UniProtKB/Swiss-Prot annotation:
It comes from Streptococcus sanguinis (strain SK36). One of its GO terms (molecular function) is alpha-1,4-glucan glucosyltransferase (UDP-glucose donor) activity. Synthesizes alpha-1,4-glucan chains using ADP-glucose. This is Glycogen synthase. Its EC number is 2.4.1.21. HAMAP family: Glycogen_synth. The gene is glgA.
Amino acid sequence: MKILFAAAEGAPFSKTGGLGDVIGALPKSLVKAGHEVGVILPYYDMTHAKFGDQVEDLFYFEVSVGWRRQYVGVKRLVLNGVSFYFIDNQHYFFRGHVYGDFDDGERFAYFQLAAVELMERIDFIPDVLHVHDYHTAMIPFLVKEKYHWIQAYQNITTVLTIHNLEFQGQFPDSMLWELFGVGYERYADGTLRWNDCLNWMKAGILYADRVTTVSPSYASEIRTPEFGCNLDQILRMESGKLVGIVNGIDTDIYNPETDPLLAHHFDKSDLSGKLENKRALQERVGLPVRDDVPVVGIVSRLTRQKGFDLVVEELHNLLQEDVQIILLGTGDPAFEQAFAWFGHAYPDKLSANILFDVTLAQEIYAASDIFLMPSRFEPCGLSQMMAMRYGTLPLVHEVGGLRDTVEPYNVYTGKGTGFSFNNFSGYWLTWTFKEALKLYADDKEAWKSLQEQAMERDFSWDTASKAYSDLYQSLL
């Protein structure tokens, strides 16, 4: 099967979040399963800095962006059997970052037009064209409405994956003819219109042959007003083509037996290396080195979506317990300042590291006893899966992908891989936090059993890619 991905980012070339991880891992896993896979990405300046001497210049052409003709340079790099094709235009993509510019609408309108026209020029006409999030959500519309006259495109099946419904690509209706060069008809009849704006995500949902999200629970949640971000009505209408598939993680990278970023390796049969890592982490961040105290790790963006308003609200109560909390992350300045203040107020209990450091992140995943992830909503989440690979038990809000990947501890059966609370409130966060600490202190055997169960869970991309392969096959 020929599968082509189009996305705004993809590891290792460009990455700001979970989307980049997926584009870096899923195509590679599909190649292992015997498929022919290509990926179309923007050629950012950070891509050029890291891979400029490895990419191959193929050719260039021009694409119409409204009334203008814009340069499209095409580069290629084959990595892990995947053919990565890069759209090069320094005006749009040499910005020092991936997102956040005033003209993001124009940048990704250009990218989508270039990606659609590129398929014919590289002679890669896929069986399945898989697009991701709003940045590429207009591609199914373009294939079926603007480029339908190209015979080679008429049998392409399109799939849209929603990684985060909160970001929808809402722009003025004039973009349709000023940038995409299409008529007003589909806006006038309401197909592309939502809240008096052109809505790219709505277009993708309606025009894609199948819509996926990154967990089954999130697929259910976004059909409700609470999580639907004003598109729940459309998603309920299209629920027959909506499916959730949990992301995977790269189990070769996140492997406690071989991880090169760890000083001490371990496995589920011998966790002594985890204790050595815990001692080293406590020493590194300036906390008292104690084996008996539970270490709670946090690696996250500090935002309301990630639940840190709840954490800050309850932090004084949490720090009354015999516990150490090690935080790594940046985000909302108010949360950064709050954690910094608590770090000064409780120097023996809280280490607030307001930065991002890949090595420290790995050490926190591997050395902590508990991993705190109280997200308000979480389409999938990867951190909880990474933590479990290292025998670190997640404490999560029971929502989205967290619900699908973390089995809450059952005191009667001893089964579970972590702890969860259902009601998003400070009371239940604190109650669950204290229950986890109590189990850690009182029942070492039960705790070790939970660690072993967590480390046995299969979060590899092989499982996820098999689900995607079956989905693709069902559409052909």
